[in-house]
């Protein structure tokens, strides 16, 4: 979810607040199977990134995937994303929660969107937090796996207050 905060070298690490935050079809009977699949992909993607950092982030992209971030050129292709996603989970932690997801009628493409929050430290060791919105477009590959076709993020303005945060 996601390419977040790409203006810094720590962009893109995503981790859900909790895998249990995915919709529960036993509680919400309106959740469609396609949405459940997308939320499951998000949870697995986030868990992998939380454990392995930028290497995992890049692994989830399609060969022709695109990462879009604030104020920087698009990063096009998995090879370029691998070269730019060099952070570790120890240097940057980012949590995100998908708010919604929609599977296309063909069942081979869908998107999720939500809110993210990233945590790192500046050169002086002071905590730095970024937050914003993201969208991830997922595409089923010819081998049946799902990969990120496009990931884009937009940071919230520093003085956004509660305008851009999801209610609890």
Can you annotate each of these PLM segments?
Residues 29-39, 48, 54-108, 115, ...:
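A solvent-exposed, acidic/Ser-Thr-rich amphipathic alpha-helical stretch
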């Amino acid at each position: 979810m996601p390419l977040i905060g790409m203006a810094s070298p720590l962009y893109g690490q995503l981790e859900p607040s909790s895998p249990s935050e995915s919709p529960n079809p036993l509680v919400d009977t309106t959740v469609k199977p396609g949405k459940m699949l997308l939320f499951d992909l998000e949870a697995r993607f986030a868990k992998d990134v939380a454990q392995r950092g930028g290497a995992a982030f890049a692994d989830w992209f399609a060969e022709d995937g695109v990462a879009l971030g604030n104020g920087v050129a698009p990063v096009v292709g998995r090879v370029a994303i691998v070269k730019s996603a060099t952070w570790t989970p120890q240097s940057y932690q980012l949590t995100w929660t998908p708010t919604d997801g929609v599977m296309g009628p063909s069942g081979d493409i869908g998107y999720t969107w939500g809110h993210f929050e990233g945590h790192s430290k500046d050169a002086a060791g002071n905590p730095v937090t970024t937050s914003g919105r993201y969208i991830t477009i997922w595409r089923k590959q010819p081998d049946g796996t799902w990969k990120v076709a496009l990931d884009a993020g937009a940071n919230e303005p520093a003085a956004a207050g509660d305008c851009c945060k999801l209610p609890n």
